């Protein structure tokens, strides 16, 4: 690399095997056309509808573990709360600071976990992503199970990625069909889609690091501490 400063953060020229491959931030070669590998990784046939994204309660007032999200920071605490129940399910409709978080295994184990989350910043709709370290399972934060179902179905069809849904409508989506993590498209083609997804997320969430928080939600090493 040829760089303008010793910190190396902005290379002006990049060479590979003696050949100039990038100049002033632009790749000079041809897009990869060798075909996609590691597709069809969305093994979610066990999901059957919006009911999969609701949390059953054993009694009229349901005590359940709630994840507390630090604003623009990591998930760091878990407490038990008694939440209202409607028709046998935990109801968050009357509390704008509550949402639901769901992690669905997409690698063939047919398992999912649903838990309330407080202070994430989302007040309506649903956000879903398969970029979720380290397991990269389908991870969703949502207020509406119907929107969560639509987001999950959108990513099943696209092979993974990110989807934002509000009132039954997909506001934005980014398809990442290679293992649910990568795209075969060029940076120039992807950039507008990424910007659209980021805008849609920001419109639904108060925090500006919502996607980053979601991408570490399923990381066991970053799990919430239980404060009983």
Which residues fall in each region the model found?
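Active-site microenvironment of metallo-dependent hydrolases
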Residues: 1-228
